[in-house]
Regions:
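Non-catalytic substrate-recognition and accessory regions of acyl/acetyltransferase enzymes
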Residues: 1-105, 109-175
Length: 175
């Protein structure tokens, strides 16, 4: 195994996209059919953790995450935070998955932290956003995200979570 230390933008010519399997069909399908296409269209950007093998042309994908932009209506956010009364820009953590053969090795946490750091970098150096938002797929995903105390429910269902950029900057000690 020659697992990269860092995530890199998805590239269908370099990464074996079609062989990725994580045990969640919707997550597999997104990577197989939409990740590279959506990146080309400017709809989202997917980063992968590649596992390069000398005997193969394309690197296996150990994990991936996808970020996009999302506007949140002001009534969904706490009125006491000084935000204006129009939709707030946020970063959507749209996808996060670890290939089945790499699960149980800490890559879920590593992927989440990489995604959150990328969101902070993008917010600081490109397009400012108020928070990171994510939609929880199922109960196992909820258990995973609940390990990170900084995520808070954004809606009554509790399945849409968010964390303000200001909290992430403190968490990662970013000025």
């Amino acid at each position: 195994m020659a697992l990269n230390n860092e995530f890199e933008p998805i590239d269908a010519t370099q990464h074996d996209i079609k062989k990725f399997r994580c045990g969640k069909p919707t997550m597999d399908e997104f990577l197989h059919r939409y990740a590279a296409k959506n990146a080309k269209l400017g709809l989202s950007k997917t980063w992968v953790l590649a596992d390069r093998q000398p005997e193969t042309d394309k690197a296996a994908i150990a994990a991936y995450y996808t970020l996009s932009l999302l506007s949140i209506a002001p009534e969904q956010l706490n009125n006491g935070n000084g935000l204006p009364r129009y939709p707030a820009p946020t970063t959507l953590l749209a996808q996060l998955a670890v290939a089945s053969s790499y699960q149980g090795k800490g890559l879920g946490t590593a992927s989440l932290l990489a995604a959150l750091m990328q969101a902070v970098k993008t917010s600081d150096n490109g397009l400012p956003t108020y928070a990171v938002v994510l939609d929880v797929l199922d109960e196992s995903a909820m258990a995973f995200y609940q390990q990170f105390a900084f995520f808070k429910p954004l809606d009554a269902s509790g399945k849409r979570l968010f964390v303000p950029m200001s909290v992430l900057k403190k968490q990662f000690d970013v000025a």
